[in-house]
């Protein structure tokens, strides 16, 4: 069944839908979330600015406001995402479906572009996406590549992976390069060990997918990178989306193209 972004958010809010959001509302941008106390917001904004491949900002909320009008007219961040991770002192403490009981007046929402946003363009060009075929979450991996630090925020880059034949990988570079607001072109193609990934069958987030003998692993910078930064910062309290469980926005993907 197809939904408008508003309808999809209502389905999530009412608990009629849950799980990863890849493949839904393909014409509209999806967003990663980082929700932090106001005292850390300036440093985190600088972190995003210094790491634009992994942390391209789509919108920022006002302190204490769960609405981000730039992302959607009827949006309620507290309930419009399928699942959230709650971090305490840099450790993931719990997973929740709603932020109603955790919301505070000092929390600032950062919405960060997601590679799910360009997947519909890839599919329209006939490029198969294995995680959608297998109906699982996209695999995501921690790398050894360091982020540019800002204040307390640092950590290592996280990447998502999609296996493709060489010709499809070339076309994927051409297509995704037009969308820097949702991570843009891949950051690595081929040997995962070169970026510190030991085993593609054991992702740090999401689910493993089949990589066939005639395919290359293609890696994009991932909006889970802020969660690595939150871990390294060891903030007393922070919130993020559960990887793969995104906020669907009202932003048409076509408006994010730069070419």
From Swiss-Prot:
**Keyword Disulfide bond appears in the UniProt entry:** no
Keywords on this record?
A: Lyase
Q: Name one GO molecular function term.
A: lyase activity
- Going by the entry's taxonomy, the superkingdom of the source organism is recorded as Bacteria
Q: Which InterPro entries match?
A: D-Glu_cyclase, Putative_hydro-lyase, UPF0317
Keyword Lyase appears in the UniProt entry: yes
What EC identifiers does the entry list? 4.2.1.-
Belongs to which family?
Belongs to the D-glutamate cyclase family.
Q: PANTHER family under this entry?
A: D-GLUTAMATE CYCLASE, MITOCHONDRIAL
Could you identify this protein by its name? Answer: Putative hydro-lyase Bphyt_4813
For this protein's source organism, the top of the classification is: Bacteria, Pseudomonadati, Pseudomonadota, Betaproteobacteria, Burkholderiales
